[in-house]
């Protein structure tokens, strides 16, 4: 992607996958930077942390924003070097798997609960019926899948997990057993879109709770999972405090939980949970993949009344419900009034569902097809 953005510019490119370049960067970083003058993109920079001190000196003396684009596939190593040497001198952009709008070439505008914005998204998006939505969910959104370089998603995810566990996870701790970690990931995937229950995950994975917490942190840091925290406000009482867990890529969830096809998934016991995961992750990615923070929460009180998503934006709270139905009624929006006691005013609401076109439930709530997000 960055190489595409570089086209037509004077920016150079070097990858430290090249062992000769890597050796030079490690043994003589000053000479390396003389040969690869900024502006430059240095890929897999985590292999030569010796560069960071020299990049820091350059940044302090030249004040050229964007002089160095640094990328890496091993997050822990990369971020350790950045935090140690480049704190305050670097902007960090975490790249998740692709959003559906990116895959379709429909633009990169973040999702907003605004009628004009929704109609514009509808014009650019690629329509899909229920079968088509579950095909997207099952196939996943990894770049290699989206670009059709790998037509068999099951083979891709098998290889992806082997590489991921052997390289990124084992790098953090040689003591991590690969088979146990895979069983742990399967236990986590089986609980996507649920309130986090570390005890149950640990029990299913046959590990202790401390291990489960540590391994969840690994999954979060490596950009595999994320959490929606419950919306909290001093004026709202009796709210739960446990976050809900989601995966950025539903194709990985489907592989881990062993669904054999999109058709079987659509009728299966996890169809609602994985559909919710898909919608939440897609909305989050429309923000994250443009370098913006998504202020997404969920609402649940001690009476088990719940709103799937609460989007805080532009001074209002937008409640969002996710349903598999293609004919949503006004009864689905009644729960939105639970936010009326919050100190932040309630804005427009949305039912994200299988309806074929953007529409309205009433003056304050919209119907949004899942393919539009």
Residue ranges and their predicted role:
Residues 1-16, 36, 217, 223-225, ...:
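A cross-kingdom feature that marks ATP-driven nucleic-acid transaction machinery
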Residues 10-39:
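Short glycine-rich substrate-engagement loop in P-loop NTPases that contacts/grips substrate
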Residues 20-22, 47-49, 77-78, 145, ...:
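Catalytic P-loop NTPase motifs of RecA-like helicase/translocase cores
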Residues 35-51:
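Conserved P-loop NTPase "ATPase switch" module shared by AAA+ and STAND
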Residues 52-76, 80-85:
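Conserved catalytic/switch belt of AAA+ P-loop NTPases
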Residues 71-75, 81, 89, 96-98, ...:
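A short beta-strand-to-loop transition that corresponds to the Sensor-1 phosphate-sensing loop
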Residues 76-92, 104-109:
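Short regulatory helix/loop adjacent to the ATP-binding pocket of P-loop NTPases
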Residues 100-101, 105-281, 288, 294:
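Interdomain hinge/linker elements that couple catalytic modules in large macromolecular machines
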